[in-house]
Amino acid sequence: MGMQVRIVLYAGTRDEARQAARAAFEEIARLDWIFSDYRDDSELSRLVLRAGQAPVPVSQELYEVLDRGQRLARQTGGAFDITAGALTRLWRGAIRDERMPNEAELRSAMHVSGTDKLRLDDTAQTAQIIGAGLRLDLGAIAKGYVIDQALTTLRAHDVTKALVEAGGDIVVGAAPPGEAGWHLTIPHAGCEVVLAEAAISTSGDTEQFVEIEGIRYSHTVDPRTGFGLTHRRIATVVVSDGFTADGLATALTLVEDVEMEALLDLYPRTRALVGYPRLPEGPLGPDYYLRVYDEASTQNGSNTPGLFAGCRR
């Protein structure tokens, strides 16, 4: 899936730690074979090759991720779209080559994208891609699923105090010895949060973007327009699992400001921190104005109100 993974754990013995870590990395490798769009032999790639054909039986893991992706698409009015892989690839190339995709390229990529072109059957556990050319991109949701499963594997080996990180997404188990939780930094907010049995994910255009004719385009594509995002925003989500955190963090960079609270209300006990850069940038990069979404979490009984209290506004 084109990502580095880091595991930190506490175990009774060195051998126990080694065995648990090996099992977790083996699980990650197994899931990479399912979800990767970089591998021609992955289950995802083989599904795409059968576009335009009959429904295809898929693994439980792939079905769960596809189903969650389609649900987020509905909840965001199509702003989050796992079927927009052709657009994602087009803008990857645009960033690499520092050029604007031409109208024909954009039109072609949008034509083969669309959630209506992916049909799922929960009873038969099948997926069907309608028409040729569609590419699935699970990069904004599968990472969270993978690190959740890695943490579950560690727990199965009696390792409960652990952290798993992949591409900026983090899940943590029980707190390290002598600590209230894992101390995690949110760089754009200038603060630290302390978490246990939780997940945190950050999404935004802080690193991957291209500037063309004075306009900055993000690597995150709005499938409704076909263009990389031009509004600058970085979102951090804290919730109980990485699967939810990963997808929601990306979704919050895509939806309109007025839609954020309604989206978060669909996920009880979720907290979010959304940053907007103050311009012009200073020599050390942007300073962010922060919007905190913590009220809904408190109302739903969260035991950690004020999680972002130390973050600058």
Which role fits each region the language model picked out?
Residues 1-313:
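Mature catalytic core of soluble alpha/beta enzymes
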